[in-house]
Curated annotation (Swiss-Prot):
SUPFAM superfamilies: PRC-barrel domain, Translation proteins. The keyword Chaperone applies. InterPro entries: PRC-brl_dom (IPR027275), PRC_barrel-like_sf (IPR011033), RimM (IPR011961), RimM_N (IPR002676), RimM_N_sf (IPR036976), Transl_B-barrel_sf (IPR009000). Belongs to the RimM family. This is Ribosome maturation factor RimM. GO terms for molecular function: ribosome binding. The PRC barrel domain binds ribosomal protein uS19. Binds ribosomal protein uS19. It comes from Bacillus anthracis. Residues 97-170 form the PRC barrel domain. An accessory protein needed during the final step in the assembly of 30S ribosomal subunit, possibly for assembly of the head region. Essential for efficient processing of 16S rRNA. May be needed both before and after RbfA during the maturation of 16S rRNA. It has affinity for free ribosomal 30S subunits but not for 70S ribosomes. GO terms for cellular component: cytoplasm; ribosome. One of its GO terms (biological process) is ribosomal small subunit biogenesis.
Length: 171
């Protein structure tokens, strides 16, 4: 069975020439939405996602605007509103060392270099220069950890374990 990953959500149409407005959920929109690439539309009714080929991509405000081969007007793409854009796992591509997909990080247990368990990563935020990992603690408020070399010492995806150095003021 194919494992699917969300890369965007179709929130509306744009204009009358078949453009769709996408809220992107990928770190690599230029690569993911490149003309000629194939994405898969998964509608709200379920069922197997079906392929569409990208014929144009541009950015408009906070959205990515896409057109698909064979869908040349607004009436043909209206049906896609609310649908998700997905890719199969084999289209994710390799990342450089020290880079991870969100689905690999979320669910990892976090410990200090002394071995003290802090909690589990529940979310990844991208507020600016670096990602911030949100750690759900067993008790108390969530902990925010910046993904920088001074703090994150080791990431072991296979064992779902992240080791951090606690700097002053972090806890």
């Amino acid at each position: 069975m194919t494992k699917w990953f969300n890369v965007g959500k179709i929130v509306n149409t744009h204009g009358v020439k078949g453009e769709i407005r996408v809220v992107s959920r990928t770190d690599f929109p230029e690569e993911r939405y490149k003309v000629g690439n194939t994405l898969y539309i998964s509608n709200e009714k379920g069922g197997e996602p079906f392929p569409v080929k990208i014929t144009s991509h541009r950015q408009h405000k906070t959205f990515d605007l896409l057109t698909f081969e064979g869908y040349g007007n607004v009436n043909e793409v209206e049906q896609f509103k609310g649908s998700l854009l997905k890719v199969p796992e084999d289209q994710l591509g390799e990342l450089a060392e020290g880079e991870y997909y969100y689905h690999e990080i979320i669910g990892c247990n976090v410990v200090t270099e002394e071995g003290e368990a802090l909690g589990t990563i529940k979310e990844v935020l991208s507020p600016g220069a670096n990602d911030v990992w949100v750690i759900k603690r067993p008790k108390g408020q969530d902990l925010l950890i910046p993904y920088i070399d001074d703090v994150v010492l080791q990431v072991n995806i296979e064992n779902k374990l992240v080791t951090i150095h606690v700097t002053e003021g972090l806890l």
